C-alpha cells in the first residue's frame, strides 16, 4: 500500500496539473487568444530556443518604466536560474505624471510592486492583463481616500492610467503570460518604476521632483533598492509591506 502522505501528494499534483491544463484550454477557447497564439507561437518559440528558455515558457517577470515609456519582459525556466531579457516593448501612451497613484480618477499610472491577477480575453482594449492594484501598500498610503482600481496592461494606444502597448505586442505578451500561468506561475510579478534608475537623464528628471518632495524621495529609494538588486542578480528579492505602507526588501533565498 502507498503511504497516505504519498497518496495526498499525488492527488494534489494531479489536481494542480488539471487546473493548469483547464486554464490554457479555457483561454484558447476565446477567438482573440486562439488567433494570437497562432500568429505568435513560432516567433516566440524561436526566441525561446535562441535564449535557452524552455517552451512553453515557464516563468515571467515584467517591469515597466514610466518616464522612459518601456515595458520589459524577462523569462527563466525555474527558481534557481537567473532571468534573461526576452522582450522590450514601447509603452505607446501615458497619462498623469511621475508619482504613485493614490486616489481614484487622478489618471496616474501606479508605481510599486504588483502581480497579474486577471486575464481579460474580451477586453475593449484588444487583450488585457489586470494588476492587483491597489496592493497592501497602496491601501495604506491612500488613507481614507478611494485609491481606485482596474489597472491593466492592454492593447490599443489610449489610456487613463494603465500601461498600453501595440496590439501585436499585446498578443505576444498575453500568450506568454497565459503559458506561464498554465505552467504553474500563478503570480506573475510586475514592477512599475518611475524611471530607469541607471539612466542619467531619467535620474536628473526624478531628482528635481524628489528634491521638492521628501515623501516621494523615500518611496522612490525603496523602489530603486528593488531595481538595483534585480539588475545585479537577475533574480527577484523578497518584498514585504510594513504597517506604514513602505516596501522592505530581502535577498532572494535562491541567490
Regions picked out by a protein language model, each given a short descriptive name:
Residues 22-52:
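Start-of-domain marker
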Residues 65-68, 90-96, 190-196:
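Acidic helix-start/capping segments at beta-turn-to-alpha-helix junctions
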Residues 1-2:
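N-terminal secretory signal peptides that target proteins for export/translocation
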Residues 43-61, 73-76, 93-104, 109-116, ...:
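N-terminal post-signal-peptidase region of extra-cytosolic proteins
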Residues 17-21:
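Boundary at the C-terminal end of the N-terminal hydrophobic targeting segment
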Residues 105-254:
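Exported/periplasmic cell-wall-interacting domains
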Residues 77-92:
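Short Gly/aromatic-enriched secondary-structure transition segments
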Amino acid at each position: 500500500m502507498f503511504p497516505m502522505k504519498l497518496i495526498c501528494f499525488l492527488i494534489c499534483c494531479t489536481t494542480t496539473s488539471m487546473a493548469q491544463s483547464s486554464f490554457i484550454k479555457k483561454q484558447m477557447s476565446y477567438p482573440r487568444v486562439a488567433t494570437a497564439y497562432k500568429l505568435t507561437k513560432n516567433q516566440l518559440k524561436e526566441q525561446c530556443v535562441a535564449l535557452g528558455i524552455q517552451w512553453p515558457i515557464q516563468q515571467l517577470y515584467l517591469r515597466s518604466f514610466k518616464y522612459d515609456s518601456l515595458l520589459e519582459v524577462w523569462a527563466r525556466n525555474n527558481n534557481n536560474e537567473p532571468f534573461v531579457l526576452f522582450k522590450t516593448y514601447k509603452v505607446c501612451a501615458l497619462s498623469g505624471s511621475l508619482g504613485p497613484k493614490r486616489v481614484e480618477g487622478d489618471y496616474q499610472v501606479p508605481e510599486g510592486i504588483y502581480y497579474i491577477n486577471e486575464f481579460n480575453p474580451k477586453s475593449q482594449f484588444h487583450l488585457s492583463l489586470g494588476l492587483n492594484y491597489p496592493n497592501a501598500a497602496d491601501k495604506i498610503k491612500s488613507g481614507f481616500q478611494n485609491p481606485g482600481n482596474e489597472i491593466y496592461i492592454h492593447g490599443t494606444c489610449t489610456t487613463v492610467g494603465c500601461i498600453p502597448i501595440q496590439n501585436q505586442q499585446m498578443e505576444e505578451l498575453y500568450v506568454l503570460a497565459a503559458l506561464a500561468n498554465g505552467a504553474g506561475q500563478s503570480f506573475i510579478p510586475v514592477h512599475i518604476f518611475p524611471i530607469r534608475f541607471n539612466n542619467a537623464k531619467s535620474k536628473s528628471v526624478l531628482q528635481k521632483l524628489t528634491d521638492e518632495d521628501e515623501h516621494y524621495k523615500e518611496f522612490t529609494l525603496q523602489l530603486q533598492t528593488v531595481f538595483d538588486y534585480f539588475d545585479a542578480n537577475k533574480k527577484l528579492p523578497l518584498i514585504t509591506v510594513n504597517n506604514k505602507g513602505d516596501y522592505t526588501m530581502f535577498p532572494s533565498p535562491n541567490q
